[in-house]
Amino acid sequence: FDFEANHHFFYLTGLRRENMALVLANTHCPAHVILFIEEPIPDMERWTGRRVTIDEARAVSGIDDVRYIDSVDSLISRCIARETVEAAYFDCYRNAMGDVDSYNMHKAKRFMQAYPAIALKDAHPMIAAMRMVKDEDEVKTLERAITVTDQGLRRVLATLEPGRMEYQQQAEFEYEIRMQGAERVSFPTIAGSGMNGCMLHYGTNQCK
């Protein structure tokens, strides 16, 4: 599966790479906002591509204090040892009750085991509320996404004819939006024809 960053992490940092973390400490520790990234390893980068450097992470996120991810646990431990910490917040979002625990959920459970005296709280509702209010740049981005979607749908209509496969119309839509500058679709394309058109989450796109 393609990696998809936690949407709240992307909202707060502008970064969409794996194995990163963001710590906001409302204590007297030296740094209150710390971004953690993977350390570049040349041998690994030959196989999987370049990793984000500290300078690049600073430039994208606007966060000055950027460190390597292998130091995140020790920093949290030091902060807790030095300060009186009453509560810790984790982004513990689940799509549904039956979902597998996210990485954040696993970290939260480990935190509870290590520090049972500290109240564990869910930061998800607070960040979700922040994301509901859009600034001018975000509104422009949404308007651009609407325009690109419209162009993609118009291409689907222009190429639609009897005998075409659903996945062919999916390809037409996704080709157009990418040619218009979109990196990807927001969710898997639903190209339901006939009775498949009434399925809210149809996704096989294998029929004519």
Model-predicted segments: where are they?
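Short, basic/aromatic beta-hairpin or loop at an interaction surface
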Residues: 184-197
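Short, small-residue-enriched loops and turns at beta-alpha junctions
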Residues: 128-130, 160, 197-199
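A composition/biophysics-driven feature that prefers long, compositionally simple stretches
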Residues: 1-151
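Flexible loop/turn segments at secondary-structure boundaries
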Residues: 43, 96-98, 176, 197-200
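Active-site pocket-lining segments that scaffold enzyme catalytic pockets across diverse folds
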Residues: 136-187
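Beta-strand scaffold of nucleotide-dependent catalytic cores
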Residues: 35, 189, 202
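Acidic/histidine-enriched ion/cofactor-binding microenvironments in catalytic or ligand-binding pockets
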Residues: 13-16, 110, 197-208
